[in-house]
Amino acid sequence: VFTTMMVLLLGEIDISIASIMCLSGCCTGVAFEAGLPIVPAMMVGLLVGAACGFFNGILLVAFPDLNSTIVTLGNQILFRGIAYMILEDKPITSISSKMSFLAWSKVAGIPLILIVFFVETLIFAFVIHRTKFGRSLYAIGSNAKASRFSGIKTNQIKVLVFTLSGLCAGFAGLFLISKLGSARASIAKGYEMEVIAMAILGGVSTAGGKGKVLGAVLGVFSIGFLRYGLGIVNVSSQ
C-alpha cells in the first residue's frame, strides 16, 4: 500500500499491481520448477515485478499525454495474459513446502508478515516524510510543471516510483503464493482496487500531493477489519 501511496502522491495511479503480483508469483514458481533454489527463484519474481513497474514508468515518461489509468489498465491485461501464457492456469504446487515460511512463520510469537509490515511502515514513513525524495513526491503531485522548472527530476522520480511499485507488488506476490501454497495465473484478481481503496480511505488524495503514511496504515487496518467482520458473518469480501 505504501508504494501505491507514493504513486498517488504523484497524481498518478497504478492499476496493474495485482497482475504484477500474479506474474511475479508465477515466474517464481516456474524458476523453482526449472531447478533454481528457492531464494534465487524468489529473486526472479522480484526482478520481474521491478521490470513490470519500470515498463509502466517508461511508458508514462515516453508518452506524457497518456493517462496512467489507461497505461496501467492496459498493462494489467498484458501482465495477466503473460502469466496465462506461462502457466495456462495450471497450478505449481511444488513450491508450497519451500515457501510456506513467508506466510506462516512467527518470530517471538509474532507473525513474520506483521513484522515485515511494521518494518515497511517505518522505512516508508522516513522516506516519504523525512527525505528530499519524499518532499519531491508532494511537490510533483501538487504542481508537476513548477516542480520541473524548480529543478526536480520529475521523469526520473516517476520511473523510480513505478519501479518500486512493481518491486513491492512482486514482493507481495511471493507472500501470496506462500499463503496459497501454489502459483497460478488466476491469483490476486481484484487486489488492485482493494489496495488503492486502502490508500484513499487513509486520506491519500487521487489528485496528488496529499497523504500521510499513518493514514495509509489506518486504511489497511480498516479494510482488514472489514474483511474479517464479513468473514465472521459468512459474507464474501470479494
Predicted segments with their positions:
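Helix-loop-helix "hairpin" substructures at the membrane interface of multi-pass membrane proteins
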Residues: P37-G45, A51-N56, A108-A183
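Alpha-helical transmembrane segments within multi-pass membrane transporters and channels
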Residues: L36-Q76, L218-G219
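Single transmembrane alpha-helix segments in multi-pass membrane proteins
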Residues: V1-A34, I58-D65, A199, G203-V213
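Hydrophobic alpha-helical transmembrane segments
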Residues: S19-L23, V39-L47, T69-I70, L114-V119, ...
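Membrane-interface helix caps of multi-pass small-molecule transporters
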Residues: M6, V30, A34, A51-F63, ...
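Hydrophobic core segments of alpha-helical transmembrane domains in multi-pass membrane transport
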Residues: T3-T4, Q76-A83, V116-V127, F162-G173, ...
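Transmembrane alpha-helical segments in multi-pass inner-membrane proteins
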Residues: A169, A183-Q238
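Transmembrane helix-bundle core of multi-pass membrane transporters
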Residues: L66-F133, I157-L160, K179-A188, V235-S237
